[in-house]
C-alpha cells in the first residue's frame, strides 16, 4: 500500500484529536513537548508544524500569539484541524507532505516542528527529504524539533503479551538493527541511528528528550492508577530527568532538538 493511502486509511479509523488528553502518558508527552517548544521559542514568532494532526499543538500555540502554519497529510485529521482552528486568524491549515515544502521559501520560520512525520517515513530518501526541507525553511539560528518513536519502546509496549517473536521479527533484523520497510505504518529508531540522521546537515544538536518516559508501559498494567496530584509530582520529576541518556530508549516518544547553523 502506498504511504499516503496507508496513513489516510489509519487515521480514518483512529481518533487522533484526544490522543494527548485521554491517557497519562499522552498528557505527559504534550506537557514535555510544550516545555521544550517554549524553551526554544519563548516569545511568539512564526511556527511551522508538519504533521500537525488535528492541531493540538498548533491551536495551543496560536492561542498564545504565535503565527502558525500547520501542514497535515491525512484528510480526516486536516478536517478536524480546520474545525479546531476556527476563529484563529493567526493559524493557517494546509494539506501537504513533510517531504516536499516547495511552497515555502528558505528561512521562512522561526521554529519548525515535525511531531509526527518521522513516525511514518520508512524510506530513507523520504526521511532525508523531510529533515532537509524542515531545515531549509527554518531561519538561521532557529530550532527544529522532531519527534521519533523508540524501536525498543515499541517492543516493550506492544510485544510482551505472548507475541515477542512477532515483535522481534517485525522491528529488528538478524543483527538487531531497527527495520524500516514498506507497509510499516509506524517505524522506530534506536538512539545512535536517530542521531546519525543529522550527520552532515547544517544544524547543531541541542538535546534529545524522552517525552512520555515509561508511562505508556506502566499505564498498560491493569493495576495502574495515578491521581492528579501524583501526576503533577511525576511530571516535575520527569522534566528534571527526561534528557538523561539512560532513560531515553524506554520512552515511546523521543524529541530531537537542533538549531540551524548560521550562514
Language model segments and positions:
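Class I SAM-dependent methyltransferase SAM/SAH-binding core
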Residues: 56-100
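Short alpha-helix
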Residues: 185-202, 208
Amino acid at each position: 500500500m502506498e504511504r499516503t493511502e496507508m496513513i489516510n486509511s489509519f487515521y480514518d479509523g483512529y481518533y487522533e484529536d484526544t490522543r494527548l488528553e485521554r491517557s497519562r502518558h499522552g498528557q505527559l508527552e504534550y506537557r514535555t513537548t510544550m516545555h521544550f517548544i517554549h524553551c526554544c521559542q519563548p516569545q511568539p514568532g512564526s511556527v511551522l508544524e508538519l504533521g500537525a494532526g488535528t492541531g493540538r499543538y498548533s491551536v495551543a500555540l496560536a492561542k498564545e500569539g504565535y503565527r502558525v502554519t500547520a501542514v497535515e497529510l491525512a484528510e480526516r485529521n486536516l478536517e478536524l484541524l480546520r474545525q479546531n482552528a476556527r476563529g484563529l486568524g493567526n493559524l493557517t491549515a494546509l494539506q501537504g507532505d513533510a517531504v516536499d515544502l516547495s511552497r515555502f521559501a528558505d528561512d521562512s520560520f522561526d521554529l519548525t516542528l515535525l511531531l509526527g512525520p518521522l513516525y511514518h517515513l520508512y524510506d530513507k530518501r523520504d526521511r532525508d527529504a523531510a529533515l532537509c526541507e524542515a531545515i531549509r525553511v527554518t531561519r538561521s539560528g532557529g530550532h527544529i524539533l522532531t519527534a521519533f518513536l523508540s524501536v525498543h519502546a515499541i517492543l516493550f509496549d506492544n510485544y510482551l503479551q505472548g507475541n515477542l517473536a512477532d515483535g522481534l521479527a517485525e522491528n529488528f533484523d538478524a543483527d538487531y538493527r531497527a527495520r524500516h520497510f514498506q507497509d510499516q505504518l509506524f517505524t522506530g529508531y534506536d538512539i545512535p541511528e536517530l542521531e546519525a540522521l543529522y550527520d552532515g546537515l547544517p544544524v547543531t544538536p541541542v538535546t534529545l528528550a524522552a517525552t512520555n518516559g515509561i508511562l505508556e508501559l506502566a499505564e498498560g498494567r491493569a493495576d495502574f492508577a495515578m491521581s492528579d496530584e501524583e501526576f503533577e509530582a511525576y511530571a516535575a520529576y520527569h522534566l528534571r530527568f527526561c534528557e538523561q541518556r539512560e532513560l531515553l530508549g524506554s520512552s515511546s516518544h523521543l524529541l530531537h532538538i537542533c538549531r540551524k547553523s548560521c550562514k
